[in-house]
């Protein structure tokens, strides 16, 4: 191997070890279930994004099998060549009906959706205003676009407005935000963001990755809690890989935006389409989340219970108001130690460290699902509290 490269890589890996930021892969089985197997140990699954328990649903499995038998295992090409199966058209129509939008585009992942959409829409003559805690894919899309990047303090509307006020009136403006923040479990102030968008002549993109299938009318997303609000969002992004239990993502909004992305988005143009099996499962999942109110109600209730009990026990869970509940520890060292003890006790509790979260805010990110019982959550809370006291971390 080239020696300068070897030296550089070894130095970087050593730094990651020293900073407590080195990452390993762990073999996991049955991750679609409430209890999983990780490194051959049975654990309560409080780490996955399978929020509605659909990843193991027999109806989705059957839909995927039917489409595999009919269409084969691969799309064979990009959608703009010969990979645009009729399944794509069906799923995109379902998304438009679900979200109340004109046109939709199915893409390969939430990451490629954000990177591709933002870098296609914005250029060096534009300004993008982004919440400081937005997902890495949003940040990378802005960097790739070459646009001026204005980060506003998390959920700080006054700071955002100050930045909008001082922006050149000649420049196009784009505001982008997560709706449910993936590492904090709090939510964006969408109505106020839309008001600022309209006041300063911007457009807005919302990332519904952790809200699609859960919140709003028919689980259409946080922006659909109020119908008139959703109609004022320019572009909605959401994923099929979390609450819907599948894989892939969508972009939807007014036809002109989606037509533009279809023609300009490099992460859409230059990639092989999703396999037919995935599209079959996605179509079934969209049907289920609109009809199965009980799953969504269970998830919201479980989130409320878990948050309230952790707060009562004295844990710092920030401003979480959803099914994503962090316990903020602080240092990498203490977070890794806490995570190790929890896993030894039978809880899949994963340490989240920089650069995923800001420095000095390392945490355990818990995610409850609709399939957890109150007994499951109580069992976990008892062990979390006991271990935290033993380790003298915070309680």
UniProtKB/Swiss-Prot annotation:
Gene Ontology MF annotations: 8-amino-7-oxononanoate synthase activity; pyridoxal phosphate binding
N6-(pyridoxal phosphate)lysine modification, residue list: 242
Positions annotated to bind pyridoxal 5'-phosphate: 110-111, 182, 207-210, 239-242
Top-level lineage group: Bacteria
PROSITE patterns noted in UniProt: AA_TRANSFER_CLASS_2 (PS00599)
CDD domains assigned: KBL_like (cd06454)
Protein name, per record: Putative 8-amino-7-oxononanoate synthase
Cofactors named for this entry: pyridoxal 5'-phosphate
Pathway entry: Cofactor biosynthesis; biotin biosynthesis
Gene that produces this protein: bioF
Keywords: Biotin biosynthesis, Pyridoxal phosphate, Transferase
Residues at which substrate binds: 23, 135, 356
NAD found in the keyword field: no
One of the protein's GO biological processes: biotin biosynthetic process
Entry similarity comment: Belongs to the class-II pyridoxal-phosphate-dependent aminotransferase family. BioF subfamily.
Catalysed transformations (reactions): 6-carboxyhexanoyl-[ACP] + L-alanine + H(+) = (8S)-8-amino-7-oxononanoate + holo-[ACP] + CO2
Subunit structure, as described in the record: Homodimer.
